[in-house]
């Protein structure tokens, strides 16, 4: 395991925040399969001061009054979403893998490298016009994010923003989400 290199880092919240995130990301080779370099954000989550700084930065960036609810994408997005919701004094809604929610839900499927996955959100998660900040830990190809943004809108919410801690820019997720704006604290 190695630390993500911090020289030449960039992010939508500025160099200082990007460097903070980069300094707490570990590269794990060949996980979850050979040839993949997994970006482990657990060191950031476990560093209370750094995690608080990142969460405060996200709330400042979007503005405390610009969203009514935070949506977290399963699973690490739950960690980020709950912290942002607490800091902003709003509620949190999970977007889960298929079959994990107990009530009637909307579902959206998206392509994986070998197959398909489905996400769900409760149909009564939002009222019409509810402003929703969607967050996840990592943006890769954008399939999960695109499905989640579509689910929020189908459930009556208005996407107020989309934020990730880490964007793997070379995989094109940001472009896939156009014209929706993407806020990434660190882009590699």
From Swiss-Prot:
Its EC number is 2.4.2.7. GO terms for cellular component: cytoplasm. It comes from the Bacteria. It catalyses: AMP + diphosphate = 5-phospho-alpha-D-ribose 1-diphosphate + adenine. Pathway: Purine metabolism; AMP biosynthesis via salvage pathway; AMP from adenine: step 1/1. GO terms for molecular function: adenine binding; adenine phosphoribosyltransferase activity; AMP binding. It holds the Pfam family Pribosyltran. It is an enzyme of class 2 (transferase). Signal peptide: none annotated. InterPro entries: Ade_phspho_trans (IPR005764), PRibTrfase_dom (IPR000836), PRTase-like (IPR029057), UPRTase/APRTase (IPR050054). Keywords: Cytoplasm, Glycosyltransferase, Purine salvage, Transferase. The keyword Disulfide bond does not apply. GO terms for biological process: adenine salvage; AMP salvage; purine ribonucleoside salvage. It is found in: Cytoplasm. The keyword Phosphoprotein does not apply. PROSITE patterns: PUR_PYR_PR_TRANSFER. Homodimer. NCBIfam families: apt, PRK02304.1-3, PRK02304.1-5. Catalyzes a salvage reaction resulting in the formation of AMP, that is energically less costly than de novo synthesis. Belongs to the purine/pyrimidine phosphoribosyltransferase family. This is Adenine phosphoribosyltransferase. The lineage of its organism: Bacteria, Bacillati, Actinomycetota, Actinomycetes, Micromonosporales. The gene is apt.
